[in-house]
Amino acid sequence: LQHWERWGFHRGKHYLIGIKPPKKLGWPEPVIPPSNWENTISFYNGSIGTIISQDRKGTSNSLSLDYLDIDEAKFINFEQLKDETFPANRGNVNLFGRHYYHHGMLITSDMPVTKKGSWFLNYKKDCDQQLIDAISSLVVEEYDIRNRIKTSGHISLYAKRRLKEIGLHLAQLRSKALFYKEYSSVYNIEVLGMDFIKQMKRDLPALTFQTSIMCKRPS
């Protein structure tokens, strides 16, 4: 949540946790309001997120979800996840099916050190690098066109048509893509600072530093 604050999303103004948004905020109603707001993150645009815990069985069985955000994946029970939560990622195709992220997943974690916690590493073999490269190429082209428009203050008919084509291509490719990447904390050096990396190397056990900070698989 501190990152949301840093990015300009403030609690009580842009999102709330565990309570129904008061009408005085003027936020739109969710398409499907939750029956219980206790485990709900609500946003100022009317969207909501449901916080799911694996402490109890069946907490996601009755849900119809549009997207999954799985944090600290190395601590997740994969058997419970695939039996309960994956099947719940099924809702509202008629409403949001045109969006390429619909029914997608974001999985983030430190590098696991146990076999049980390594379930998500298997996605690496399903990452089609040629598809990812094609997406990257289109993104670069889109950026270049938009940058030229910004610099010149003029948008040609070709640029307008090409941006539309790129948008359609990207939506189609992204809807089929699985992106897998392992990043060390060095990639986030502008936020963390080099002193943090040095301190972690000094203070953490070697295995913890290699897996949690440098994102290296245990040998």
Feature locations, PLM:
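Phosphate/NTP-binding elements of NTP-utilizing enzymes
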Residues: 1-219
